[in-house]
């Protein structure tokens, strides 16, 4: 049965029962994929905080970090959804390259392997990073940040509707759905800009 804490999140009755059923599937798949008694992670829920050469801060939380006897690192992240269709794996590959770059920039070591474990369908997506990934990710993130800065300057943020809109907590404020976006707070914009600092001497 769901605990009081669980019920406060998922509700009671049928909703709680559905949530527990879905959780059982995920847990069952996990134990079919891995035997935790054989795992000795070097870290769990590991926070990484790094800066790109441009000075842009990047952060993330890695579910599991494994260290081989020779010191090589493996980055593992768990997903509760299904694995992506091969035609749509680019976003997943981006995440793995992002983690690899963040670890390389913050710890000086490029992970030998990154893995996304999809518990819903019991599949694992594996990618072995290469040194060029760090520069590629840095370039992509810098480009994204430049686009954000342009919109901060113009105070125009064009809606980009997609199927993910149903999950957005700000949907009711979005002009795309008949909402009225609030005025941009100047102090918030200034705070956002602090994500990038001038690069230090090399």
Task: Kindly give the residue locations of the regions a language model identified.
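A short linear-motif detector with a strong N-terminal bias
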Residues: 21-25, 42-45, 53, 93-97, ...
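Broad hydrophobic/π-residue packing in well-ordered secondary structure
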Residues: 10, 22, 26-34, 78, ...
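Generic recognition of stable, solvent-exposed alpha-helical segments in well-folded globular domains
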Residues: 18-25, 59-60, 91-98, 132, ...
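Short amphipathic alpha-helical segments and their helix-coil junctions
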Residues: 4-6, 75, 81-83, 144-152
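Metal-dependent nuclease catalytic regions and adjoining charged, substrate-binding loops involved
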Residues: 70, 103-202
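Mg2+/Mn2+-dependent nuclease catalytic core
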Residues: 46-137
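Short helix-to-loop capping/linker segments positioned immediately adjacent to catalytic or ligand/cofactor-binding
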Residues: 10, 14, 84-87, 105, ...
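A non-catalytic, helix-rich entry segment at domain boundaries
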Residues: 1-45, 51
